[in-house]
């Protein structure tokens, strides 16, 4: 019996074209991610998101950290973020010394309303960090208009779009992920943070590349324009921030460029799978289906039911891989207990929510099989 995976498995999402591109990259002699393929990948992904600059990194989690670090906010600043989230959307807020201001989300969209965001704003609010969770989006355009109406254009809007690739010109900074389970992948890993302001990009590069002030120029006139205590010093080894090593390899960019060419076809398959799920399950009264009104590029099909564990056990026994809805109410997890709060929707989804595959490695027969098994489960009750 075929296994229905939550995410593309093995060769369901890549093939000879990606393998050839990686081989060509290696034969060209590029290893570190400073070559022409990385530059091209950064430019093309940034364009998809409506941003001017892209910085290729090793994961979406790293992209989220660099997004916040690039702003150089005052310690203790508040950053509004939803309780229904993924852990590494939240973690860098705390790691970098800022204060998360949690809000709830909406039951069938899985993202917060603009009203919820606006009502959480205080004089200490310096940024908003919201994920396009499972691929759905809040109304970023309305949020930007409301911030302008409030004369709070000082608040940075960060869009964590790890779960999907989309165009959101109304955010200041966007991040995305190329992890193996996502819409496209850069060889199983990778992420990108994207900016409109060059100074934010420059600061992100410093944090990505060990904290160094310099870039990859080999020009001696560039390299020795700085000094340390009066000593002219190579800015390739001059450090301005407490940095990291978050680079990806050139081969990852080569892989990602081929995937980007296939993005529209992947997206179309996912859309067809989502619509088939919704049609097949519309009469299953035990399920809460997602709000698909804006036709988002869903990462997976999010569902809710009151007897989740029993259903998931049944599906797994029938070779259907399942997932819960990420962190649910993240403040209930061990590492975040000091922020513990009740959130009606996040708590409900933590209790009842789950995800099933709708990816481009699946076909209509796969979706029908999953739906038939769900109906079989409820028919036995």
What are these regions (language model features)?
Residues 56, 81, 102, 193, ...:
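Conserved SAM-binding loop
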Residues 11, 154, 166-167, 183-184, ...:
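Short secondary-structure boundary/capping segments
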Residues 1-32, 240, 357:
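N-terminal "arm"/small-domain region of PLP-dependent enzymes with the aminotransferase-like
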Residues 31-78, 92-95, 102-104:
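Phosphate-binding glycine-rich loop
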Residues 69-161, 165:
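PLP-dependent aminotransferase-like
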Residues 156-187, 192, 199-202, 235-238:
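Conserved active-site segment immediately N-terminal to the catalytic lysine
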Residues 91-93, 183, 251:
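Hydrophobic/aromatic ligand-binding patch that stacks against planar heteroaromatic rings
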Residues 36-44, 48-54, 115, 119, ...:
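PLP-dependent aminotransferase class I/II
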């Amino acid at each position: 019996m075929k296994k229905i995976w939550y995410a593309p498995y093995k060769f369901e999402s890549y093939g000879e074209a990606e393998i050839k591109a990686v081989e060509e990259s290696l034969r060209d002699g590029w290893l570190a991610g400073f070559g022409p393929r990385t530059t091209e990948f950064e430019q093309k992904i940034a364009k998809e998101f409506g941003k001017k600059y892209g910085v290729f990194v090793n994961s979406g989690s790293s992209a989220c950290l660099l997004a916040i670090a690039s702003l150089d906010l005052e310690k203790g600043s508040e950053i509004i973020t939803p309780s229904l989230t993924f852990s590494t959307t939240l973690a860098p807020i705390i790691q970098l010394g800022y204060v998360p201001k949690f809000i709830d989300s909406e039951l069938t969209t899985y993202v917060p309303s603009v009203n919820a965001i606006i009502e959480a704003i205080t004089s200490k609010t310096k940024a908003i960090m919201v994920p396009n969770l499972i691929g759905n989006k809040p109304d970023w355009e309305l949020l930007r208009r409301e911030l302008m109406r409030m004369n709070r254009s000082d608040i940075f809007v960060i869009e964590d779009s790890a779960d999907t690739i989309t165009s959101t010109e109304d955010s200041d900074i966007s991040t995305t992920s190329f992890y193996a389970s996502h819409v496209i992948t850069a060889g199983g890993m990778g992420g990108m943070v994207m900016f409109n302001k060059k100074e934010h990009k420059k600061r992100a590069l410093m944090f990505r590349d060990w904290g160094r002030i310099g870039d990859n120029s080999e020009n001696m006139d560039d390299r020795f324009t700085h000094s340390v205590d009066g000593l002219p010093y190579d800015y390739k080894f001059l450090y301005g921030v407490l940095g990291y090593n978050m680079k990806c390899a050139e081969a990852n960019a080569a892989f990602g460029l081929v995937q980007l060419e296939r993005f529209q076809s992947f997206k179309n398959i996912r859309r067809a799978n989502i619509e088939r799920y919704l049609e097949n399950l519309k009469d299953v009264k035990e399920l809460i289906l997602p709000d698909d009104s804006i036709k988002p590029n869903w990462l997976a099909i999010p569902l809710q039911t009151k007897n989740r564990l029993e259903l998931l056990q049944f599906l797994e026994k029938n070779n259907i891989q399942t997932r819960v809805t990420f962190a649910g109410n993240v403040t209930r997890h061990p590492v975040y207990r000091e922020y513990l709060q009740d959130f009606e929707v996040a708590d409900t989804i933590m209790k009842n929510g789950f995800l099933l595959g709708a990816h481009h490695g699946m076909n209509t027969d796969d979706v029908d099989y999953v739906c038939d098994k769900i109906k079989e489960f409820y028919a036995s009750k």
